[in-house]
Regions:
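Histidine-centered active-site/metal-ligand motif
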Residues: 108, 153-156
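Short catalytic micro-motifs in class I SAM-dependent methyltransferases
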Residues: 101-108
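Short, glycine-/aromatic-enriched active-site segment of Class I SAM-dependent methyltransferases
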Residues: 129-154
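Active-site loop signature of alpha/beta-hydrolase-fold enzymes
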Residues: 64, 92, 108, 133-136
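Helix-to-beta-strand junctions that scaffold the AdoMet/dcAdoMet cofactor pocket
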Residues: 109-110, 123
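Conserved N-terminal segment of class I S-adenosyl-L-methionine
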Residues: 1-95, 103, 113-116, 121, ...
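Short glycine-centered segments of the SAM/dcSAM-binding site in methyltransferase folds
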Residues: 125-127
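Substrate-binding/catalytic lobe of Class I Rossmann-like enzymes that use SAM or dcSAM, i.e.
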Residues: 168-178
């Protein structure tokens, strides 16, 4: 918590906007939504304002989050349909949901394959938001990779293709994916990120995938379901 005291709360409306866009695209109106690794719970608050009939459930293992949850429940009209649970989702959860969210989650997990496989049976659909930390520039500089490991706890680094293959290898069928334009539009961009916006725009325009692999600056939003479901 000392390394990331804000828990990236300023990014929550932007991130939820990405989730809502993908759900609207597929005309999905989930009645039960669960977020694994829900952090402060802000994502669920914003999603609850979009899906006004949905029951909302959040799980996280960090005991420091309890005050945020109490604050959010007390100050928000969603308190009658919003619940938080402290502990491991796979140990505590007894429900199946219309939708599970994992927004910046499995890059923090020591064994992402087992974690993802164990989650398969708990929902019909899944939305993932995945940071794409791995690029030619980040490998050459090295510091960006060490920073996200030290400051926000990323244990695994992905390109677009590695992220999608990780999901496929864990039993998921990819229904849709898209870049989020994170380095060009997210609220918490650093000065260095803003300075890189011009070269990134140029390379993205020439060839999006190649530009991302070279200069980074992107995250991925993915809609998936269990294979064979």
């Amino acid at each position: 918590m000392q390394k990331n005291p804000g828990w990236d709360r300023e990014d929550s409306p932007w991130k939820v906007g990405q989730v809502n866009a993908i759900l609207r695209k597929f005309d999905m109106k989930p009645k039960t939504i669960c977020e694994i690794g829900c952090g402060t719970g802000d994502n669920l608050l914003h999603i609850g304002n979009e899906f006004v009939f949905a029951q909302l459930f959040g799980f996280d293992i960090s005991p420091q989050l309890a005050p945020f949850w109490k604050e959010n429940i007390k100050s928000n009209s969603l308190k009658n349909r919003l619940k938080f649970y402290l502990g491991d989702f796979h140990s505590l959860n007894k429900k199946k949901y219309d939708l599970i969210l994992m927004l910046d989650v499995f890059e923090h997990v020591r064994d992402p394959f087992t974690f993802l496989e164990k989650s398969l049976t708990f929902a019909k659909y899944f939305v993932f938001h995945i940071p794409l930390d791995l690029s030619a520039l980040s490998v050459l500089r090295n510091t960006p990779l060490l920073n996200v490991r030290e400051k926000v706890g990323h244990l695994h680094y992905y390109t677009k293709d590695l992220a999608l293959e990780t999901l496929k290898d864990s039993g998921y069928e990819i229904l849709y994916w898209n870049y989020t334009q994170a380095s060009l539009s997210s609220p918490s961009r650093s000065l260095k990120t803003r300075m890189m916006s011009i070269p990134r725009k140029i390379f993205y325009w020439i060839h999006k995938d190649l530009g991302v692999r070279l200069l980074g600056g992107e995250t991925l939003i993915v809609l998936a379901k269990a294979k064979g479901f």
